[in-house]
Amino acid sequence: MFQSLKLTHNSSIPFLISSGGTTSRAAADNHWVLDLRKNYQNISYDLNNTCVEIEAGVTMGDLSNFLVNYKRSFPIGLSGKTGMGYILTGGISPLSRSRGLAIDQIMEIRGFWGNGEQFHLAKPKESKSSILEWKGLCGAAIFLG
């Protein structure tokens, strides 16, 4: 994946990513498209800390079906066909009022910025200012002050 990002950066060809089944921007003329749905489908559950790790191609329906085995749930919204974009854009669901947005459930995220640099962001456990920065990143900025 990293090589694909570097190639598009050097050639100035626009780059699109697809990870679910509902985006209107999964393909376009004269664009590179990286479809994560086929090769990034892993889901794992850590019984010790009750955290789930998912790869970028997992749909919310697949996640929900997986979590049933552990008597767990995730606020996936009204469609099981959405992918990682659902979470990264906030993720409003019927459970949002009581459980928060989907993005509020994220403990850490790893990926690549548009320029090809890797990143790893984790929910802070220390200072109040770090927690406010994390909440702002997760979409709560308009409620913070």
Residue map of PLM features:
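General beta-strand structural signal in soluble alpha/beta enzymes
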Residues: 15-19, 34-36, 45, 54, ...
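Short active-site loop/helix that positions an aromatic residue
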Residues: 4, 62-69
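Glycine-/small-residue-rich beta-strand-loop submotif within the FAD-binding core of flavoenzymes
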Residues: 28-59, 65, 93-101
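Loop/turn elements at helix/coil->beta-strand transitions in domains of secreted/extracellular proteins
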Residues: 10-14, 30, 70-73, 117, ...
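Extracellular/periplasmic catalytic domains that process cell-envelope and extracellular macromolecules
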Residues: 8-10, 25-28, 45-46, 67-68, ...
